[in-house]
Regions:
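Predominantly soluble domains enriched in secretory-pathway, periplasmic, or organellar proteins
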Residues: 1-503
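N-terminal pro-sequences and low-complexity stem/linker regions of secreted or lumenal proteins
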Residues: 467, 483-999
Length: 999
């Protein structure tokens, strides 16, 4: 069975999990429909927060996700929206394609009724009511402002002036300048000419009981702003951390809760700090701060009605911390794990009380569920006559919060729930979730059978744009019996029934395989590369990079195993690298990535998913007596005085729990952490490298030479070790990284990377786990890529041949008999696929891999990581991989040691490719494909992509880039793919391919 939507609103996800959002009796699931298109293509993504009005009759739903670049389904014109003047609240002359939303629902009856939808260009999680229910406030995210809306009749209207927080310049413009981040005005900022500065971003906010004070978390400035709501002015900014400070505290403040006195005036604010794993208690009169350690990566807060207890959702710890607000001490930690389970991954990320506060409901983003927590001692079970009293009467009685609290059940939801609220009666849950399956059908109807949906003209087909948010209305379960059944379903949906099952193939191979080489590539779907295979379920009409350009991808699939039902779990690189390195994500990533790629457009927020934080490498020290890109952070190079130092310590704000901890008793972290805990050896080639030194000042600069306009630039060298030019400032595995193996850089050649890998392996040998990055199938930097690799076709061929050479080399080494090569794309966001936008290529190559086989078992990135763990005999990292299935169907117990023979893509053997790049081109005996011609030359590609930035993966309009790729390779007259059938095309392949060749 492929990843798909099934009848009865059941969905199989690319993470390997199943969601059943309407399983609870009486529940309903609806998309967050905007009504802008009849096919739902412009419906909302990324529902992140709910807020119920003080009278309990109205609920707000906020999105912060990928909500832009949609088109009119008839004309194809971009859907645009007026940007409000922040001073007047009136539409300005500026319009935008950005469309975050506030949905206003009437929840006063049993029916959920949408009353209004309000467009806001940028948001980031924060939304709060005024205590009289006549106004609400919305954080404007990267726009560094807070929007205010007031009730006027039955609708809410802009209530200007909006609250300008004052970090970014040009604040009163419809859009500010995005320059107000933490490093603004520092010596490093001055020395870099503004290159290291990022923008500000406002996240959570809350309002005092008298409505006079609002407090907002400045997510990228490590501070809170205190606002007088009457004047709309910031009265003070309380800074937790400033550049140059030696103590890490209050960094990445996310959520805010305000405590008020008996008169309703604000007295304290509690703020979660996501990097420092703490809640800050801030006295608003004196600015005194108490630091309260809690669990890892805390996110949302919930204050009891009497304000005596504060509940903290700890996303990376699977716990809830309970703080006594009188003493500012943690008095209880509630585990959300199953009894005795040491693995984490539930990801608690929002909280709500029952009306009497006897129960706590916690959304579990990682389990697609809501946990039900008894906050007091569990009542003795009564006889069956008790079951009619309702869940709360049956299960709970009021108890002091200091008494042990426990999870009594879980309720299934949609994919990645982000917020839960209750109606006034307390008998109905409202849960919003972030996303849904993208599916083969761009209409993305939840119950549309595969093969029936067609891609309407002018759709945005980017995978983030296809994953839609939803809202579930769930009656509180009527009895423990019902809750128990739902809990068992949540366990089943998350694979707990697979836990502990012995796999005899893995047990056998665990004694055979001693070396795993893990290769991660970039962004291609199955159909883009392998749609033209003579076997498997591929659509040749969608094949962009066929066999002559990617012969080794094709030959490896045909010689070993074709995996035609494999899915990358992540949508894009940030999420994809999380899944590829630890089989999970964090709540930070899930909230952050879609906004960064979407409406933020890499402004304000930064790419914090591969070891760097705020574009800084926390793995290196702040200063050094011998400063270089390998010994010190970029801020230390720019400002040796230390005045510009930020992020004290080595913690990565987005690292998984357990990362960097090699104690054998610890679980979690990255794949390499588990290997090192098990006593294995690890060598890193290109994973998690600081990319700050790879950008030339223009696309015309020779990348093999120093850049006079950018003294930080590290030149590319085909022989970096011999030239003594370190290429790779590592963020992790500092002493286990080949610093001459360059990280992600589209100007570089993957064949250069292969040559450096080979040099290092010949010197240091083959470790237990090798981490190898070959990124050139991402494509880019066509203006000044090295070695004449200035077209998509030549860059793909470069990537293909590097992969082929690596497998050939390994298959001829003495260790081959106990080696396995795993090759995966981190994500497959950059192209079409007729089955699902997450379906991609993957390979497992070893002496024990089946030969000339097609394996159509549904596998995902999580299964891939799980299989590596099983072969190496190392510990699992979290719930996902511990519950996953190893990819046993790929293997046989009969070893075949026949070495692999790589094939030279013929396009690499002709101008303008550097003749020195591939010596085998001169070998008449070397297998080669026909030397196909690139449809366009490098100048065409440079011109067609001149608006795109390739210095960091995905920092561009991916949908537009995909269209450039298609027309550039297929030709301007080739229609962009308009149909994804979802059909099984594995039969009658010869006829299908003949029709394709003749078309």
């Amino acid at each position: 069975m492929p990843v798909s939507n099934l009848p009865n609103q059941v969905a199989v996800l690319p993470t390997g999990k199943v969601v059943t959002p309407t399983a609870a009796p009486g529940s309903k699931f609806n998309p967050l429909s905007t009504g802008l298109r009849s096919d739902g293509n412009a419906d909302a993504n990324g529902a992140v927060a709910t807020a119920v009005s003080p009278d309990g009759k109205t609920m707000l739903v906020l999105t912060s996700g990928y909500n832009l670049n949609f088109r009119n389904e008839t004309t194809g014109a971009n859907l645009t929206y007026p940007v409000l003047d922040p001073v007047t609240g009136q539409p300005s002359s500026v319009t935008t394609r950005k469309a975050e939303w506030v949905f206003v629902y009437d929840i006063s009856s049993e029916q959920l009724v949408k009353q209004q939808q309000i467009n806001i260009p940028n948001t980031y999680n924060g939304i709060a009511w005024a205590p009289d229910g006549k106004r609400f406030y919305v954080s404007g995210g990267i726009d560094d402002r807070i929007y205010v809306y007031r009730q006027e009749g039955n609708t809410f209207v802009p209530d200007a002036p909006f609250i300008l927080l004052g970090h970014n310049s040009n604040q009163t413009a419809p859009f500010p300048a995005y320059d107000g981040g933490l490093l603004n005005g520092t010596p490093a900022d001055t020395a870099s000419g503004g290159l290291v500065v990022t923008g500000a971003a406002v996240a959570g906010l809350d309002v005092s009981k008298d409505g006079k004070t609002l407090v907002a978390a400045n997510f990228e400035n490590d501070s809170i702003s205190v606002v007088d709501t009457a004047s709309r002015k910031v009265t003070q900014e309380i800074k937790f951390f400033t550049p140059g400070s030696p103590v890490a505290t209050g960094e990445f403040p996310f959520w805010v809760t305000v405590v008020s006195n008996k008169n309703g005036a604000a007295t304290k604010a509690y703020v979660t700090s996501q990097r420092d794993d703490e809640v800050l208690s801030v006295n608003l009169a004196t600015a005194a701060i108490v630091r309260i350690p809690v669990g890892e990566q805390p996110n949302k807060l919930l204050l009891s009605k009497n304000q005596s207890r504060l509940y903290v959702a700890n996303g990376n710890s699977d716990t809830v911390s309970v703080i006594n607000t009188g003493t500012d001490k943690v008095v209880q930690t509630i585990s959300l794990s199953r009894p005795g389970d040491r693995y984490r991954g539930a990801i608690p990320n929002s909280l709500a009380f029952s009306s009497d506060e006897r129960a706590l409901f916690v959304t579990l983003g990682g389990e697609n569920a809501v946990a039900v927590v008894d906050l007091g001692p569990q009542k003795e079970k009564d006889n069956d006559n008790d079951k009619e009293k309702g869940l709360l009467d049956e299960l709970f009685k009021f108890g002091k919060p200091e008494k042990p609290a426990k999870v009594v059940g879980r309720i299934p939801t949609g994919w990645y729930p982000n917020s839960v609220s209750l109606n006034a009666k307390g008998n109905r849950l409202y849960v919003v979730n972030a996303k849904s399956n993208a599916g083969p059908n761009p209409s993305n109807g939840r119950t549309t059978a595969a093969g029936q949906a067609r891609n309407t003209t002018f759709r945005n087909e980017y995978n983030w744009a296809l994953e839609k948010a939803g809202i579930s209305t769930i009656p509180v379960p009527s009895s423990f019996k019902v809750l128990d059944a739902l809990s068992r379903l949540v366990d089943l949906n998350n694979g707990f029934d697979q836990r502990g099952k012995e796999d005899f193939m893995m047990k056998f191979l665990g004694h055979k395989i001693k070396h795993v080489v893990y290769v991660v590539k970039e962004n291609r779907t199955y159909d883009q590369i392998l749609g033209d295979l003579p076997v498997g379920n591929g659509d040749p009409a969608l094949t962009l990079l066929p066999q002559p350009i990617s012969p080794n991808h094709h030959k490896l699939a045909l010689d070993y195993v074709t995996l035609d039902n494999f899915y990358d779990s992540g949508e894009s690189s940030g999420v994809g690298w999380n899944w590829s390195t630890y089989a999970a994500t964090t709540d930070y990533t899930e909230k952050h990535q879609s906004v960064l790629y979407g409406n933020a457009g890499f402004n304000g927020l930064t790419y914090d998913y591969e070891g760097t934080t705020r574009n800084i490498n926390p793995g290196l020290p702040q200063t050094s007596s011998q400063p270089s890109p390998i010994t010190v952070r970029v801020t230390g190079l720019l400002d040796p005085s230390g005045q510009s130092s930020i992020l004290p310590g080595s913690k990565d704000v987005n690292g998984p729990a357990g990362s960097g901890n090699w104690n054998p008793n610890v679980v979690g972290g990255y794949l390499w952490d588990a290997a090192l805990r098990a006593g294995k050896t690890v060598r890193n080639y290109g994973f998690y490298i600081d990319l700050a030194y790879y950008n030339t000042s223009s696309g015309q600069v020779d990348p093999t030479k120093p850049d006079p306009a950018n003294p930080l630039y590290l030149p590319i060298s085909p022989t970096p070790f011999a030239s003594k030019i370190p290429q790779a400032p590592p963020t992790v595995l500092l002493d286990k990284t080949d610093i001459y193996f360059r990280g992600y850089d589209m100007k570089n050649a993957d064949i250069y990377l292969f040559n450096e890998w080979l040099r290092d392996v010949n010197v240091n040998g083959l470790p237990s786990l090798s981490l190898v990055r070959f990124p050139h199938d991402h494509f880019g930097n066509f203006g000044n890529a090295v070695a004449g690799l200035r077209t998509v076709e030549t860059q793909m061929a470069d990537n293909d041949y590097a992969v082929g050479l690596l497998v050939e080399t390994l298959s001829k080494r003495p260790e081959w008999k106990e080696t396995a090569v795993f090759i995966i794309e981190d994500d497959c966001q950059d192209g079409p696929d007729h089955v699902d936008s997450h379906r991609s290529i993957a390979y497992i190559i070893s002496p024990y891999t089946k030969r000339k086989a097609v394996v159509s078992t549904r596998y995902t990135t999580v299964d891939f990581v799980r299989t590596i763990e099983d072969l190496l005999g190392i510990g699992y990292l979290g719930l996902n991989d511990a519950n996953a299935n190893p990819m046993s169907d790929v293997f046989t117990k009969n070893a075949n040691l026949t070495p692999y023979q790589s094939v030279v893509p013929g396009i690499l053997c002709k101008a303008p490719v550097d003749p020195a790049l591939v010596p085998a081109c001169q070998d008449p005996n070397a297998p080669k494909t026909a030397a196909v011609q690139s449809r366009h030359d490098g100048d065409w590609w440079a011109n067609a992509t001149q608006e795109f930035y390739f210095g960091v993966e995905d920092r561009l309009d991916e949908e537009k880039f995909n269209r450039v790729l298609w027309s550039g390779v297929k030709g301007d007259g080739a229609p962009y793919p308009t149909e994804r059938s979802g059909q099984d095309l594995s039969q009658e392949r010869e006829k299908l391919l003949a029709n394709w060749h003749n078309s």
